[in-house]
Amino acid sequence: MSISPAIDQLVENLKRLPGVGQKSAQRMAFHLLERDRGGASRLAESLQSAVEKVGHCECCRTLTEEPLCRICSNPMRRENGVLCIVETPADVLAIEQTSQFQGRYFVLMGHLSPLDGIGPADIGLDELERQLQSEPVEEIVLATNPTVEGDATAHYIADIAAQLNINTTRIAHGVPVGGELGYVDQTTLGHAFSGRKQFSR
């Protein structure tokens, strides 16, 4: 049953968001229209503004309003010599929030997936190779997701790095802080054991 074509269209577009199904989209739509029309207008304006102003960094390909993002335009970050490879701009934000990494990034905007027709050129690996050949990089940190596709992508990049004699490391995967072993899947637990390190007191 349809109440309004405009509401139907709003619900359909809200369903484009990750993890949002029909029911969630309907709840959001009705909340905005019933209780928060001012918020709905601000949401529409900010979304329109972001779509118009935000593009990709010319160097690392993350999202930014400038030709170079704030990380790539920072001389100290560029001279660090460490390049972290991630799948999405959200990964950059997640790593930056830890304050543990002081190098720069290269954002793939995805991962290798031959079954979906996504090859090396589709995620910018040709561009990455050109950068590695032209700019001094001492270490590559592979921070792709711990999935079959993420691991395949990491291996592909490691092969490129090996040909250029660049040291390659992979972020550790294991048991999350606060997690209970009984709820951890076998693959994650296996990674945790193979990546164990000396206990420091």
From Swiss-Prot:
Record SUPFAM superfamilies: Recombination protein RecR
Zinc finger C4-type: from-to: 57-72
GO biological process, one term: DNA recombination
Keyword Manganese among record annotations: no
Any Pfam family the entry gives: RecR_HhH
Ranges for domain Toprim: 81-176
Function: May play a role in DNA repair. It seems to be involved in an RecBC-independent recombinational process of DNA repair. It may act with RecF and RecO.
Similarity section: Belongs to the RecR family.
HAMAP family, per the entry: RecR (MF_00017)
Protein known as: Recombination protein RecR
Native species: Idiomarina loihiensis (strain ATCC BAA-735 / DSM 15497 / L2-TR)
Taxon lineage: Bacteria, Pseudomonadati, Pseudomonadota, Gammaproteobacteria, Alteromonadales
